[in-house]
């Protein structure tokens, strides 16, 4: 499942780059409840594939912590 793969990658990037859920949904202007449901509880019913891709692209381009 594509969303499952994106979910795993986003979590890896969040850990590596110290990127919080708050930063994701605030900067991308997404619904906090849906983003948290997807990232914390892997509830993919709350996340469209387009939003998942948008989050992944943002996380990938987010600068790394030094």
Predicted regions and their residues:
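Alpha-helix N-cap/helix-initiation sites
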Residues: 3, 21, 45-49
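DNA major-groove recognition helix of helix-turn-helix/homeodomain DNA-binding modules
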Residues: 48-65
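A short, Lys/Arg-rich alpha-helix, primarily the initiator
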Residues: 1-18, 26
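Recognition helix of helix-turn-helix/homeodomain-like DNA-binding domains
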Residues: 29-47
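Residues within the helices of the helix-turn-helix
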Residues: 11, 22, 53
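Conserved hydrophobic/aromatic packing and binding residues within compact polymer-binding modules
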Residues: 10, 24-25, 35-38
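DNA major-groove recognition helix of helix-turn-helix
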Residues: 14, 39-40, 51, 59
């Amino acid at each position: 499942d594509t969303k499952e793969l994106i979910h795993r990658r986003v979590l890896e990037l969040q850990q590596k780059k110290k990127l919080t859920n708050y930063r994701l949904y605030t900067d991308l202007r997404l619904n906090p409840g849906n983003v948290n449901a997807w990232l914390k509880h892997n509830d993919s019913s709350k996340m469209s594939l387009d939003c998942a891709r948008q989050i992944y692209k943002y996380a990938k381009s987010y600068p790394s912590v030094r």
